[in-house]
């Protein structure tokens, strides 16, 4: 136990001292997941495991950096724990589905899917009703912007002070003097004022409390939270080939969005979340049974047409054509 504690402390020290190298490690792990996909049998499961690990690594490192920078989430400790558990579930849900299907078959797969969706719904309802978290965004915890937030870790740069710079007489460009440039790993490749404005905007956005929801908005958010459970229940009643689950889920999503149509008083992050949900309605084109009966043939034909007539497109289109059928069958990819 003592060795594990020392190893943990050393890792935390490394992350706080080398945020740029940590970000490169996260990117390398995520890139490895893409390289593994389709290389051998069981490669999809291994690829998803590595991808889930990369997301958990980002979540862990962000927590370490926030603690070092004293940039705690603007929520209570209990709410922060719920958000963390919700984030962990979203990181591992696809791998858990694929692993359950591999080990326990279809029955185990659907059982794991139902348990994960139930756990996520309970956590989100607690956040909505008990903690008054408002419109819940995805991801639940905003990733830390390493480029701007990691600046205070550099001892030779103080973002709170005015940074000496030179203004060109003809071009009027603002150029940082070499003497006052931060070290390479924490340098921001933009005008000094741009970095300060960006930091201020992000800090204000993170510290802004969620918009209080009225009865109509609370019902809308509750519908959005309950939609996965309603869809799973309808699948159990009518089966995967029936149109009823697809139509019911679509009606619930559109009703939720229509009840949240008044966006004037929402924060920027909440408006972006509603825009994301609106765009995700396009996923219904890729969800069964609509995909099986209408979309699949047309999408594959279009990709093949682009591959045959536009040079270079095949490098992206062919792997996409190979992977799309597998992707569409994974519940948390298409319905999660």
Curated annotation (Swiss-Prot):
The chain crosses the membrane at residues 85-105, 111-131. Residues 106-110 are peroxisomal. Residues 1-84, 132-336 are cytoplasmic. The keyword Glycoprotein does not apply. GO terms for biological process: ER-dependent peroxisome localization; ER-dependent peroxisome organization; peroxisome membrane biogenesis; protein import into peroxisome matrix; protein import into peroxisome membrane; protein targeting to peroxisome; protein to membrane docking. Residues 221-336 are annotated as: Interaction with PEX19. InterPro entries: Pex16 (IPR013919). The keyword Transmembrane applies. It is found in: Peroxisome membrane. GO terms for cellular component: endoplasmic reticulum membrane; peroxisomal membrane. It comes from the Eukaryota. Keywords: Membrane, Peroxisome, Peroxisome biogenesis, Transmembrane, Transmembrane helix. Pfam families: Pex16. It is a multi-pass membrane protein. Residues 66-81 are annotated as: Required for peroxisomal location. Belongs to the peroxin-16 family. Interacts with PEX19. Required for peroxisome membrane biogenesis. May play a role in early stages of peroxisome assembly. Can recruit other peroxisomal proteins, such as PEX3 and PMP34, to de novo peroxisomes derived from the endoplasmic reticulum (ER). May function as receptor for PEX3. This is Peroxisomal membrane protein PEX16. It comes from Mus musculus (Mouse). The gene is Pex16.
């Amino acid at each position: 136990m003592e060795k594990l504690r020392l190893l943990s402390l050393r890792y935390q020290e490394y992350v706080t001292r080398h945020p740029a190298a940590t970000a490169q490690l996260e990117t390398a792990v995520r890139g490895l997941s893409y390289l593994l996909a389709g290389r051998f049998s069981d490669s999809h499961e291994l690829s998803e495991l590595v991808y889930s690990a990369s997301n958990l690594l980002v979540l862990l490192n962000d927590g370490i950096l926030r603690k070092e920078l004293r940039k705690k989430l603007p929520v209570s400790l209990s709410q922060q724990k719920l958000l963390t558990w919700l984030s962990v579930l979203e990181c591992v849900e696809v791998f858990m589905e694929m692993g359950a299907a591999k080990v326990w078959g279809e029955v185990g797969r659907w059982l794991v899917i139902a348990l994960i969706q139930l756990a996520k719904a309970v956590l989100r309802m607690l956040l909505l009703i008990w903690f008054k978290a408002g419109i819940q965004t995805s991801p639940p915890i905003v990733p830390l912007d390493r480029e701007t937030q990691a600046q205070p870790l550099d001892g030779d740069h103080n973002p709170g002070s005015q940074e000496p710079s030179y203004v060109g007489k003809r071009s009027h460009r603002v150029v940082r003097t070499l003497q006052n440039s931060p070290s390479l790993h924490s340098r921001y490749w933009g005008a000094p004022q741009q970095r300060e404005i960006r930091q201020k905007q992000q800090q204000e956005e993170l510290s802004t409390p969620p918009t209080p929801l009225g009865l109509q908005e609370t019902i809308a958010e509750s519908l959005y939270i309950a939609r996965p459970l309603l869809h799973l229940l309808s699948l159990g009643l009518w089966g995967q080939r029936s149109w009823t689950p697809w139509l019911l889920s679509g009606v619930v999503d559109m009703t939720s969005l229509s009840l949240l149509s008044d966006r004037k008083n929402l924060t920027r992050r909440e408006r972006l979340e509603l825009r994301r949900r609106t765009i995700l309605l396009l996923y219904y084109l890729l969800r069964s049974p609509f995909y099986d009966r209408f979309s699949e043939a047309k999408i594959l034909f279009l990709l093949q047409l682009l591959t045959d007539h536009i040079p270079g497109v095949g490098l992206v289109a062919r792997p996409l054509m190979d992977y799309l059928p597998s992707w569409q069958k994974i519940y948390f990819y298409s319905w999660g």
